[in-house]
Amino acid sequence: MNRLDHIGIAVFSIKDARSFYENVLGLAFLHQETVEEQKVNVAFFQAGSVKLELIEPLTADSPVHLFLEKKGQGLHHIAFLCNCLSEQLQALSDQHVQLIDRFPRQGANGKKIAFISPRETNGVLVELCEPKGDQHNEHE
C-alpha cells in the first residue's frame, strides 16, 4: 500500500466537467464506465503516474449523490494500490482501524476496492484498491 493509484473527484456531471480536464489541463482521457454497485458513472484521465477519476452519481441514493448534497463538488477520495486487499483489510482490522468496508467490493476497472473511514485519516476518505491480475504492473 505504498503507491497512489488515483484521486477521485465528485462531480454533478462528467459531461460538464470533462472539458476542463482535457482542454484546460491537457490530461489524456482514458475511459468511462458505469459501476452499478456504487451507482455511479466514472471517467478516468491520466495525470502523470496517477489517474484522476471523475465520479458522477446515477441515482439519488448513491453515496456520491449524498456526498455532493452535503459537501458539493470536489475531492472525494484518494486511492492507494495494494497487492492483496483481503490481507490488508485484515491487518487494518487487527490494528483496530475503523473501516467502511470490512470486505472487498467491486470497483471500476475490475478492481477490488474498500474504504477506510475518514475518522481514521484526518477527514480524508481513503480507498484501497487491488487491480485485476493483468493490471498489477500498470504504469510502473
Curated annotation (Swiss-Prot):
Instruction: List ligand-binding residues for a divalent metal cation.
Output: H6, E53, H77, E127
Species name: Bacillus subtilis (strain 168)
Keyword Disulfide bond set for record: no
Single GO BP term? L-methylmalonyl-CoA metabolic process
**Entry's Gene3D superfamilies?**
2,3-Dihydroxybiphenyl 1,2-Dioxygenase, domain 1
* Annotated Pfam families: Glyoxalase_4 (PF13669)
Q: State the family named in the UniProt similarity comment for this chain.
A: Belongs to the methylmalonyl-CoA epimerase family.
According to UniProt, the name of this protein is Uncharacterized protein YqjC
Residue spans crossing the bilayer = none
Which Gene Ontology terms cover its molecular function? lactoylglutathione lyase activity; metal ion binding; methylmalonyl-CoA epimerase activity
Where would I find the VOC domain in this sequence?
A: 3-131
* InterPro entries with a match to the protein in the record: Glyas_Bleomycin-R_OHBP_Dase, Glyoxalase_1_CS, MeMalonyl-CoA_epimerase, MMCE/EMCE_epimerase, VOC
What taxonomic classification does the UniProt entry list for its organism? Answer: Bacteria, Bacillati, Bacillota, Bacilli, Bacillales
Highest taxon in the source lineage: Bacteria
Matching PROSITE patterns: GLYOXALASE_I_1, GLYOXALASE_I_2, VOC
Which UniProt key words apply to this protein? Lyase, Metal-binding
